[in-house]
Amino acid sequence: MSATEYLRVSDLHAFYGESHVLHGMDFTVRRGECISLLGRNGAGRTTTLRAILGLTGRRTGSIMLNGREVIGMPTHRIAQLGVGYCPEERGIYASLSCEENLLLPPQVGSGGLSLDEIYEMFPNLRERRHSQGTRLSGGEQQMLAMARILRTGARLLLLDEISEGLAPVIVQKLGEVIRKLKQRDYTIVLVEQNFRFAAPLADRMFIVEHGQVMAEIAQGEIEQKQELLQEYLGV
């Protein structure tokens, strides 16, 4: 993994109307690294992803993406810099087939995966490629949501609660996909409540509480930081 810094979030504040949600988020992500934002519901993790893409209301602070300040850019410009977002609600087009959903996204960078590469990574989608979005299971919809952003050529992937509510066999498959993406030098920000899913995948974990980073835990520090994990996550 390169030590080159790909994303730096500094003193990030974000608002929904009058509600002050993020209170000075600070973290960095290196190129090819997977980091996880861990915390309870309402901690500000999803808002952080949305703020990176400019999908919240007012933002202050700094978001440096591959050396460029993006805090004042509109969402479409940020996406065009190679950012892919997989929201918790997935956003599958119900009236389109699985394959039509895959063909829909615009290109934001070179190197987007071909349909053959997608189907090799997600064999279930090959089998279901002619099925309408409404006929896909929750796990298949989650695979499709991830596959769709891989088609765009994005190199920074913002993944929001991708394991939530899914069968263990699907969660295991998604973990395998993330490992493959790390091998391909994708940079990943993983928002998760499922510590057991995130911990083996993340190079570093940031515990988020009340819209702030409370602690950073490296992959090799999990054992000695058990008390901290218990305090904030109950694990």
Give the location of each predicted region:
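Walker B catalytic motif
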Residues: 161-162
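Helix-to-loop junction immediately C-terminal to a conserved catalytic motif
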Residues: 53
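Conserved ABC ATPase signature
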Residues: 132-136, 140
